[in-house]
C-alpha cells in the first residue's frame, strides 16, 4: 500500500480533476468517487438538466481504460437494450440462448441508468443480481461483471410498497441535487466553453485495475473502534425509537460500514473515525421527511456525543454543583453573622452587628459577584450607623457598589442563619462577609477537576483536528462540530475563572 497520506493526497487531486467545470457538484462527485472506489451504488434525485448524467460520465475518467454504459429507461425498455441483444448465430447454429454483451451493462465498469423507476420487472430482476452478486447469467453460463459504480437517477422517488423498493434499498448513497444556486457559479456555467466529454484527469492520477483490486482488500482491513461502534449503535437505537424514522435494513447498515471504512482508507487512516459517520446522512434516508430527520439525528450525534461534548458538559455541571456546595459551606462559615435581639412584642425582628465590628465604614465582600445597578459588584461599602439603623428598624438601606460613586439602594435581607444576603433584580442572592474571611480562588479539589476536564477537552479537540481532514465530509458539518467543541471549552474556562 502507498503511504496513507500520499494516497489521500492523490484521491483529493483526482476528485479535484473530476470536479472541473461542474458547479456546485463537488459533494456529489466526491461521494460518487468514493462509491466507485468501494464498489457501491448511488441514486441521484433531482429535476432534469442538472448534470446527473455528466457526473456519471465523469467518473469513467477516474479509471484507466474504464468502459461506461448509460441508458434512459422508458416503460417500453427491453432487457436487450440494457444487457445486450440475443445472438442469432448462437441460437441458430447451437440452439444456445446467449446475449452479445459487448458495449452493454454486463461489460461496463461505470453504469448510468436514468429514469430508473420506469424499468420493467425483467430488467429489475437481472439488475438486482448484477448489483448484489456482480454476476450476470448469460444463457447457461454465469459471468462475472466488472461493474464498479452504478449511478441510477430519477426526478422522483419509487412508490412505497412497490416492487421497486428492493432495488432502491441497494442504492447505498442517495443524493438530492438541485439547480445551480450561486449567482457567480451560474454565470460561470453559462459562459463555460469546456467540452464536457474531454478527459480532465491526468493519467498519473487514474486508478489502475491492479490498484482497484488491491484497495478492495485493504478497505476491509480498516478497523471499527469500539467507541465508533457505540456511536453507530446509539444512532440506530435512537432511530428505532422515533415513529417517523425510516426503516434501515441490516444489509444497509453493513454496506454503510464498508463505505465508512473506505472513507477512512482514502483519508489516510487505519480506523473508522467519528467524522466518517457524517456520511450516514446520505445513506439512511428514504424520502424528503426522513432526509431532514436523519440529518438532525446525525447532527445531534456529531455535536453532542462524537467527541464527548455532552459527557464533558455533564462532568462540568457536576463540578460546578460541587463548587456551589463548597461555596455554600464556606459561606456558612465565613459570612458576617448578625445578632438576633429579643423583642417578643416587636412587629419585626431586630438585629445588631457583632461587638467586634467597630469600623465606621464597613466593606463587605460578596461570596459570589452579582450584577447590581448595571455593575458587576464584588464588594459593598456601608456606613456603620446606617446599617445598624436598618438592622434595628428596617426601611431603606444603601451602599456604595465596589466602594465607588454614590450609595445605591439595595435589596438586603437577613436569612434564617442570620447572615446578610444581597439580591439582584432576578432575586439571586449572595452572602456578605468581612474582608479576610472569604476564601479566595477555587478550592483545590475543584481546580484539579477542572484542569483534568480541560485536559480531556484538549485531547478531544486534537482528535477532531486530526480526523477532520476528510475529503468526503462537507465543510459546514466540520464547522458545526468545531463550534460545539469551542462552546464546551469556553464553558470550562469560564468555570475556571469563577
From Swiss-Prot:
Binding site for ADP: 23, 49-54, 196
EC number: 3.6.1.-
Catalysed transformations (reactions): ATP + H2O = ADP + phosphate + H(+)
Compartment(s) of residence: Cytoplasm
Keywords associated with the record: ATP-binding, Chaperone, Cytoplasm, Hydrolase, Nucleotide-binding
InterPro entries in the record: AAA+_ATPase, ATPase_RavA, ATPase_RavA_C, MoxR, P-loop_NTPase, RavA-like_AAA_lid, RavA_ATPases, RavA_LARA_dom
GO cellular component labels: cytoplasm
Regulation of protein activity: ATPase activity is stimulated by ViaA.
Domain of life: Bacteria
GO MF terms, alphabetically ordered: ATP binding; ATP hydrolysis activity
PANTHER family, per the entry: ATPASE RAVA
Function per UniProt: Component of the RavA-ViaA chaperone complex, which may act on the membrane to optimize the function of some of the respiratory chains. RavA functions as an ATPase.
Family stated for the protein in its record: Belongs to the RavA family.
Subunit structure, interactors included: Homohexamer. Interacts with ViaA.
Protein name in the entry: Regulatory ATPase RavA
Originating organism: Escherichia coli O7:K1 (strain IAI39 / ExPEC)
